[in-house]
């Protein structure tokens, strides 16, 4: 194994093993839910696709949260968010919300690109079938005369 990938692998393993588990969990679920509601309500008026994605995302999160509560995995105490956050975290939260706002033209993902490509191929196939059907009708009309 080359030394650079080995060093990167060791570094990533060491860094990921020293992350405290509390940093990976939300501190206040009501804060997360209200932020999720804000994000979904802001993007819901854009178009039908964002509405459907928002609905599916909300259903998934509610189902996932319900499953976690039922299995007893989720044991987070309910603390007020103001006591847990420092002023530095408040400013970083504001920066994050500014950064996460939707742009006017969102980037096209690979899934969307492949979906559009499949639709274009299907439309071309349908057009070819229509042209072939027109030619077949024309040949049958000439042979029938």
Curated annotation (Swiss-Prot):
List locations, semicolon-separated: Secreted
Primary subcellular site in the record, as a coarse category: secreted
GO MF entry, a single one: hormone activity
Q: Which GO terms describe its cellular component?
A: extracellular region
Q: Which residues carry this modification: Valine amide?
A: 143
Instruction: Give the signal peptide range.
Output: 1-22
Q: Which InterPro entries match?
A: Corticotropin-releasing_fac_CS (IPR018446), CRF (IPR000187), Urocortin_CRF (IPR003620)
Output the Gene3D superfamilies linked to this UniProt entry. Answer: 6.10.250.1920
Superkingdom of the source species: Eukaryota
- Keywords assigned by UniProt, alphabetized: Amidation, Cleavage on pair of basic residues, Hormone, Secreted, Signal
Q: Does this entry carry the keyword rRNA-binding?
A: no
Family named by the database record: Belongs to the sauvagine/corticotropin-releasing factor/urotensin I family.
Q: What does this protein do?
A: Urotensin is found in the teleost caudal neurosecretory system. It has a suggested role in osmoregulation and as a corticotropin-releasing factor. The non-hormonal portion of this precursor may be a urotensin binding protein, urophysin.
Name of the protein described by the UniProt record: UI
Q: Which organism is it from?
A: Carassius auratus (Goldfish)
Species lineage: Eukaryota, Metazoa, Chordata, Craniata, Vertebrata
